[in-house]
């Protein structure tokens, strides 16, 4: 009884977490939220020269179709509730990228009306510094997000509400 011939290279053994994380990292759909000059660089990143499709990254215009939001530019206190509403409309699991000096730390605008970093309101997964960061920097940040997704554990259980996702990074 049993298998008479070895299976060879036809079988891959992995954990369910790694399989689900591989699928998630291979199909990141970021929602663009361009607030200032960083949005121009974000649009340049989406051009054919960079070919984000080869990484499974496709920009979406609806928060209900996106699993990542790229906050690109200056976040004002008047715009913050809109960003939070859009973030809440995104399905789980969801990730946040802060693109540019203004989104990361408020940039040069240390005034009463500017939020000093989007991490005051949302959990940021990847920070991309620069004023504005080049398209290559955004591409590198997206690849770092893919690495972070692969390190998460209990991702499959969170799909069914069995627990929260935990990053080991």
From Swiss-Prot:
Cellular component GO terms held in the UniProt record: plasma membrane; respiratory chain complex I
Keywords assigned by UniProt, alphabetized: 4Fe-4S, Cell inner membrane, Cell membrane, Iron, Iron-sulfur, Membrane, Metal-binding, NAD, Quinone, Translocase, Transport, Ubiquinone
Subcellular location(s) per record: Cell inner membrane
Membrane topology, record value: Peripheral membrane protein
Cofactor binding, per record: Binds 1 [4Fe-4S] cluster.
Source superkingdom: Bacteria
Entry EC no(s): 7.1.1.-
Catalytic class of the enzyme: translocase
Residues given in the record as [4Fe-4S] cluster binding sites: 37-38, 102, 131
Catalyzed reactions: a quinone + NADH + 5 H(+)(in) = a quinol + NAD(+) + 4 H(+)(out)
Cofactors demanded by this protein: [4Fe-4S] cluster
SUPFAM superfamilies: HydA/Nqo6-like
GO BP term (any one): aerobic respiration
Main location as per UniProt: membrane
One GO molecular-function entry: NADH dehydrogenase (ubiquinone) activity
Subunit structure and binding partners: NDH-1 is composed of 14 different subunits. Subunits NuoB, C, D, E, F, and G constitute the peripheral sector of the complex.
NCBIfam families listed in its UniProt record: nuoB_fam, PRK06411.1
Its job: NDH-1 shuttles electrons from NADH, via FMN and iron-sulfur (Fe-S) centers, to quinones in the respiratory chain. The immediate electron acceptor for the enzyme in this species is believed to be ubiquinone. Couples the redox reaction to proton translocation (for every two electrons transferred, four hydrogen ions are translocated across the cytoplasmic membrane), and thus conserves the redox energy in a proton gradient.
UniProt record similarity statement: Belongs to the complex I 20 kDa subunit family.
Protein name: NADH-quinone oxidoreductase subunit B
Organism lineage string: Bacteria, Pseudomonadati, Thermodesulfobacteriota, Desulfuromonadia, Geobacterales
